[in-house]
Structure formats: C-alpha cells, structure tokens
Amino acid sequence: MGSPNLRQSILNRRMLICIFTGFASGMPLYVLISLVPAWLRTEGVGLKEIGLFSLIGLPYVWKFLWSPLLDRYSIPLLLYRPGLRRSWMLSTQLLLLITIAMLGFLDPLSHLWYIAWLCLGIAFLSATQDIVLDAYRRQILPDQELGLGNSIHVNAYRIAGLVPGSLSLILSDFLPWNIVFVVTSGFVLLGLILTLSISEPTSKHNQPTTLKAAIIDPFDDFFSRQGVQQAFLILTFMLLYKLGDSMATALATPFYLDMGYSKTDIGIVAKNAALWPMIIGGIAGGILMLKIGINRALWLFGFVQIVSILGFALLARIGEGLWLLGLVIGFEYLGVGLGTAAFVAFIARTTNPAFAATQFALFTALTAVPRTIASATTGICLL
C-alpha cells in the first residue's frame, strides 16, 4: 500500500466519526463506575451499598438480548425520520443527556433507591447506544480500515473516562453536585452533534423484515457463512485469545501489594504507566493493521501480549523498584492496547453488516466470559 493511500486511510472522515463514537460510548459508563461511586461516598453512603451498585452494569453484559430490535426497528421521532441506526443513536443520546443531569438533583441518603433505578436506566441506555454505535461503525468502515477505526474508537472510549473520572471530580470540590452532573451530561452533546451531522449508512445487505428474522437470521448467517466447524473454531478463538492476558492482570493490584509497593506507589505509577501505553499501543496497532492486515496482526500482537506477561515474573524475581514497576505495567498495557486493537477488528470483520447490531453484541458478550472466569479463578490457580 502506498503512502498516499495510507494517509487517506488515516486522515478521513470515517476516522473522525470513530473518535466521536468512542467518546460517546465511554462517557456514560465512566459516569457510572467513576463519578457516581465518588458522589455517593462523599454524601455519606456506606461502602456496602456502593458495592451493590456494581450490579447496575448488568445491561452491558446482557445487551445482546435486545440487540435484534436494533437491527429490525427504527424509532420514529415525530416528523423526523433519521433512519434505522441514527434513530436509535439520537433517542439514546437525548435520554442519556437528561438522565445523567437528573442524578445530581437527588439526595443519596433519602433517594438511594431512586438513584439506583436511574443508574440502571442509564446503563441500559448506554448499552443500547453501544450496540448501535458498534453497528454503525461496522457499516461505514471498509474491511481494511476496521483495525484503525476500531482502535481509534476504543482509545477515544478510554479517554472519555477522563471527563467523569477527573474533570468532574475536580469540579465537585468547587461546585454543588447538581451543577457537576449537568456539566458532565453536557459532554453527551458531542454524541448528539455527531448523530445530527452524519448520514444513515447505506447497506448492501437486506435488513431483517420481521423480529423473528432479526433473532434467527444472525445465527443462521454466521454458521452458513463460516460453516459449522469453522464457526465453532472462531468462537473458541474469541474465548481464548485474551484469556492469558485476563488471568495475568486479574490479581495485579494484590500482587503489587505483596511485592511491597505502597498503595500510593501503585496509584501514581499504575495510573500513568497503564493508560498512555495502552492508547499508544492501540493507535500503533491500528496503523500497523493497515499495512499487515488483521490476521497477521493477531499473531504478532498476540506474541507481544505473551512476552509482556513475562514482565510479572521478572518483577517477582527482582523485587521492589518503582522504575521496574512502571516498566512492567507500561509494557503489559502496550501489549493490551495492541492485542485489543487486533481483536476488536477481528470481531468486527466477523460480523455481517446486515446483522451488525446483534452479532457484534453477541460476540462482545462472549469475549467477556473468560475475563469474568479469570477474575474468579486466578486466585484459586495460584494456591
């Protein structure tokens, strides 16, 4: 591929759209996992109750259950007909704008259940927005741009966490919480601007015409395109590709503590040594995939993941040293960024654009299984 074509693949409108889709996806999630717990604790809510709030994340796991609706039905908005994908984007973003702003007007001590239900609603809307943004991205990106486009999306998703996780927390020291949540919800407007400024993707494939077809056809399409044996091999690959990485990082913080590092050391070093190498790895991986393709990237980046995990063994052998902790974490998350870039691109390529909402949601739910199992069983394996 010549350099002009490479520049065109990097510097185009589709990549700009991927920045906005990533930011729009990440914002609501980080409101729930970063800002809401800090708000509740500041207002005097107990750790037990705050811990139970993690259950509001269930819609992200089970989003595949209603994903066929997004492949079948569009939402009419009075006289405005934005189309199948954009109607869901616009509806979820408008509701997210309102519901996130509403949080700050409730008292955590006297309205905790109302807050819990409202947060569950935000999680449902956010998961639904994720479904449609994944589908939209799959439809607008040609296969050769899936790697870079999805890398940009994932990194913008992570950077979005700096708004509720950093900016909003800083503002809360100077402003009342109701203003903080209104300001935070204002960042949802970036997603709305995106939705209003883009066009509905053109589809070369026939969309399902009945709800039954929207549920059954994605499965039939996947197994008929790949063949039963190949389909099961692909699903097994999706389950296993990130398993080692998940197991290596599942108990990382307890491991650092056992090695003698203080919580301050871990907080300062881990935060800075993880985020930016992961972002650099994701962007570099996306650009490399334009040159080498997704299949070769899976092998190459997978090897980097394996080597980076060995850093934990080096840390265990050599022992304490902040420079070593930063080096090990940085290299590990560089591998995470590279591997995630290739893996998400592979998942996107495996989907059929006609059933992108359902298949993408199913595949991403499947890939969450080994991460959950790793978190639960890694400690047992070390006994």
For each predicted feature, which ranges?
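Helix-to-loop junctions at the C-terminal end of transmembrane segments
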Residues: 63-82, 280-297, 382-383
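C-terminal transmembrane helical hairpin of 12-TM major facilitator-type secondary transporters
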Residues: 296-343
